[in-house]
């Protein structure tokens, strides 16, 4: 397949801009001396190019997408339509608040809804993704300790069953990361936690249910231990889909958390975004929240102002506003009855699929799971040299997206499966049969498993090479070649370059 830069011809285009003479503008920034090298293609070529690209990818609209810890549920298209209403799209973030009262009402209403769902009292919608929310929440914890003159609290405790971005976010916020192990049941080791807390503990980061799909039965004791040591408790909302509307992080003893609107609340997040990672917190942390705080006045109008001790903006304006609109539509559609039903169905689907696969694949933990479960291919790797990667690649030839591989790290040769609530029983049965068929193939012809996939547009990629020596932009021969590592990298390797 050609890159879009390799298509078209000089002078070809798809714009219909009428002739005009733009006014001269005096700018105070450097201007380009040469025109951008952009593809010159017709609208037909452009449409076909991106249609071809779409055919080579797999999304939730194409088929089963059980990517563990990612909650790849169906994204209702009516939410997209609502977010594209002119009242939402034809506005500017610098407009006066009196001109955008409807938008402020949406922001205020979803903040209120998220607080009700989580058991928190205040919320900011500024963070644009989950890890961004983690970082923001950790800055709130840091600001609170510093406001009390308690600067010695420099350590964040992170269990080995926590979400993968937690240690990185804590380090980014300039905390020392203290890892503690799980017990034999896959939950937090209470004795290890007691030994880890002290007068230098700033807080604990925890995902519940955790990344092996288990709800920690000692959650109230865990948060009590941290609070007794003077620390705060951070809830990673990555797995909130399993418990939304049923139990609330605030009631478990957590002080601050983030939510993933692009996961739990069904906004699109394939292809890298856009996402949204709001942070909700208890009252005592509200003065530190970033961005504008929206208040409803007695006359029904809304105002926006900065919190008294705000940590500063973590993103410009109201972040990914149209993503928030989509999530708000989802919440309104499900309501107080539908939200817990969705969570219960997600748990039911995961347990149904786990039960069907148990006895064929080895489960990492022999417990009732929540919204996802983890299988281990360690035995297959040892006996037949068939890895989790081999199984995942073979699944691609059957039209389903592979599960998350090699995560969580505490499970060797892991495959983490999250079917979500939007899949039917028929789809789950079909997926189970595919998993069983692939396992049978691996037992009959283990050596062939290293060659999968056969039917995808691209076979096995050099994933190690891509990670260590990524080529993330296209450089054509028409542009000035750049020397990288002693080689001319302009236009190298054709299709290996990033398209468009």
Q: Which residues make up each language-model segment?
A:
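A short, small-residue-rich loop immediately preceding and capping a beta-strand
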Residues: 121-127, 155-158
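Conserved PLP-enzyme active-site core in the AAT-like
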Residues: 101-105, 132-299, 309, 385-386, ...
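Non-catalytic terminal extensions of PLP-dependent enzymes
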Residues: 1-122, 146, 247, 297-303, ...
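General small-molecule cofactor/ligand-binding pocket signal
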Residues: 124, 178-180, 403
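Short glycine-centered, acidic/aromatic-flanked micro-motifs in structured strand/loop junctions
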Residues: 127, 182, 206-209, 375-377, ...
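A generic short alpha-helical patch detector that favors 3-5-residue windows
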Residues: 196, 319-322, 365
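Proline- and acidic/polar-enriched loop/turn elements at helix boundaries
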Residues: 66, 127, 182, 208, ...
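Conserved phosphate/anionic-ligand binding catalytic regions in large, soluble enzymes, centered on
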Residues: 58-78, 126-134, 265-280, 284-285, ...
